[in-house]
Amino acid sequence: MTHSLPELLAPAGGREQLEAAVLYGADAVYLGGSALSLRAKCRGFDGPELADAIAFAHRSGVRVYYCLNALPFDEHLPAVEEQLERLPELGADGLIAADPGVIRLAGRLCPSVELHLSTQAHSVNAAAVEFWKEVGVRRINLARELGKDAMTALIRRFPDMDFEVFVHGAMCLSLSGHCLISAWVNNRPANLGLCTQPCRFDYRGIRLTVEEAVRRDGPFLDVTQEEDFSAVWAPMDLCLVRWMRDIVRMGPSALKLEGRTKSGGYVAQVTDAYRTALNLASSEQEEISADDFVTELFHTASRPLCSGFFLPERRVERPPRNFTAHPVVARVLAPAGNDGWRIQARSPWNADSDAELLLPGMKRPVLRAGSYALENHRGEKTDRLNPGMEGVVHLDAPDLRPGMYIRLRPESAPHSPEAEA
């Protein structure tokens, strides 16, 4: 039986991330404004920027879903209504919401815009699907707390509904993101997009001992201590690239990548890996192994990767032995002469370092030191570009395009806290 490929839905926290998602193979992007989209830290799109972003995506054949998935208080509703009224004229392909009040307002103020239910709504059973279907929701993002079999059962029970599955990115400590830690500790409510992620902070326990009396087949809590502090609450990140064929057979309409606060380099690498894995999932070819995809994603990872609740027993991914992450070293901006490209450095780039091009399709041609030359913004030959500096790289790369990225090879990548993932 042949299964159609699900839509690949990538995050677009800003213009660069939008361009990266489109260039590296997303079928659709999700974005929001500067408020009420659950990502107050990302710049988002407002006014003319939003209209231009939607038009840009549509010219590339990419759909755009607008996030209004915060859980607003009464004082926020006028702003919600204003945003909803503008969506039809802007041409948004869908609205992502979680709050029943927002969904009801959307049905009245922008009935032509397709309604998608956010993961914040925590949809885990058939009765909930029936309810959301009755109030006009077309697509439901299934809760990360569901396993493969439970998701498959819901997808097959409701063939007239679209279902979306998160396959990669951060997982919240609490149920479907309904966390109060940030609001309690820092007066920054996560459900209004202001999460400070205190679950990722490092803590030191004073006179604290944790034991679990029943489960004695291993540690209840694995704590790694660095400089006397530990990230005791931080969940691992989700990574389901290894199971692409299984997920395609489940029949979801879309696969979602988390990361609206991430960099353009992150979006490029993660989108490229999942786009390539999806394309290969529709064939019997094994051009790239599952281990290779996981290794590629470790270049973007800031936390351990795992299968979450997808499998009955969680699988934790381990990087290959002696693995070193490749930092993104530059973004390509525009052509500069016959063999040159104007670039912006994202990490320290020394001209005696090997590098590799990030070409769509998981193609990673190597640039050996000596096969390319760097210039600063004045056109002078240089041995080093620092983060934020613009310059020119001269190289032989006919497949390179504006918006693509270059990263260092591991054996030559200097450690730098400034390096972009």
Give residue ranges: language-model regions.
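Conserved phosphotransfer cores of two-component systems
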Residues: C110
